[in-house]
Amino acid sequence: MVMLISLSLKKVIWMNVDPNLTKYMIKAKIYTDGVVEKPDVVGAIFGQTEGLLGDDLDLRDLQKSGKIGRIEVEIDSKKGRTEGYALIPSGLDQVETAILAAALETIDRIGPCKAKVEIANVEDVRVQKRQKIIERAKKIYQDMNSKGDDLSESLVKSVREEVEKSEIISYGEEKLPAGPAINDSDSIIVVEGRNDVLNLLKYGIKNTIAVQGTNIPETVKKLSKERTVTVFLDGDRGGDLILKEMLQVAEVDFVARAPPGTEVEELTYKQIVKALRYKTPIDQYLSMHGMNDELKEYSQRNNLVFTNHNSEQKKEVLEEPEAEKNEVLEQGEVTQQVSVPKEGYLDLLNPHDVSRRIEALSQLKTTEIYDSNGQRIASFPVAEAVDRIIQDPQGNTIVTGGIISQRLIDVAYNAGIKNIYGLKLGHITKKPVDINVIAWDRST
């Protein structure tokens, strides 16, 4: 009962409190031995404190001057007894309010009944005000930030989109969407559509070009013969189809894919960097994904291109030592005896010999391992190089007709290899200082 009285009384009081005057709320608990009414309680408060505290703290004068608010009483009578609360709003300072509260406890009669008054508490009204201010300020601040962030993000997005649109160019006879660095880059990234190019431009990747569908344009075919090509495709069936088309009509060095079920145009910066960092050499990609028919067809097509040249090269390599055996004058006189190189030997200190060997290996799609004396100790297909080196780490130098990838460098370093010579340099993010890496297409 007392709790219900307290709640309802508090509600009434807060409705009547003048927020400009009230600093404290005195809550007095009332007990009487008999039945009394509200006017009896109010009369006792004024009557029994009159003259008790002097003229400066007289309740009637304080109420007239607005220092004390309207006294609210809530009581309930049961079984011949009355209990309840009286609440007195005070605009006095702390000391004066405390004196006034203590004076209320001197009341010993209310109406005709004996009574007891106890101060339950004196509440600082300003604390609640401050708490309400804090809560409201937080809400206002959050609303301001939300609107400010939205505006800021919208402005940044608008400016960025305009910059990206101004950077994208139309390249080749087919007017393909491309990044502004497509003309100057040794390596290019082939994507599916314009939105893919825009998304990569957003994160500063500018050597991109879009094929605009599965019908690969002549411009892309031509570029693939001149540049190191990474195809960066969606993680869906459409990406698979574009890759197959590229393999049939163009040259591909690396494959990067968006996560399954996602498109390049919707990738975040972190996803793009991860996909490009872990791009896979084309032969390894086809092998890992069970695309054996495509791998066979791609290999055969590239071998056919080099068949005649390869035969001439083999002939040149075979005939050259024979010519070196004896240098003969027109008269048939032998002027110099030259030793014949051992089979499988390569002069690793002679750049000309190394470059010719790399050219021959590129046509054979082969990787070779040499010891420190230049003697060949292993030979295997480029696609098997990483696995073979892991299984049997040996030798001093790798000579490969394929691309020098980050994975090959890591494996070679762990195997104790000191030199890697290859045809092209892939996307390298780190290179140990004590391993020598040379790509002939960039060093000659």
Swiss-Prot record:
CDD domains: TOPRIM_primases. One of its GO terms (biological process) is DNA replication, synthesis of primer. RNA polymerase that catalyzes the synthesis of short RNA molecules used as primers for DNA polymerase during DNA replication. Also part of the exosome, which is a complex involved in RNA degradation. Acts as a poly(A)-binding protein that enhances the interaction between heteromeric, adenine-rich transcripts and the exosome. Its EC number is 2.7.7.101. This is DNA primase DnaG. Binds two Mg(2+) per subunit. Gene3D superfamilies: 3.40.1360.10. Its cofactor is Mg(2+). InterPro entries: DnaG_primase, Primase_DnaG_arc, TOPRIM_DnaG/twinkle, TOPRIM_dom. Mg(2+) 2 binds at residues 234, 236. Belongs to the archaeal DnaG primase family. It comes from the Archaea. The gene is dnaG. It catalyses: ssDNA + n NTP = ssDNA/pppN(pN)n-1 hybrid + (n-1) diphosphate. Forms a ternary complex with MCM helicase and DNA. Component of the archaeal exosome complex. It is an enzyme of class 2 (transferase). Pfam families: Toprim_4. GO terms for molecular function: DNA-directed RNA polymerase activity; metal ion binding; poly(A) binding. It comes from Thermoplasma volcanium (strain ATCC 51530 / DSM 4299 / JCM 9571 / NBRC 15438 / GSS1). GO terms for cellular component: cytoplasm; DNA-directed RNA polymerase complex; exosome (RNase complex); primosome complex.
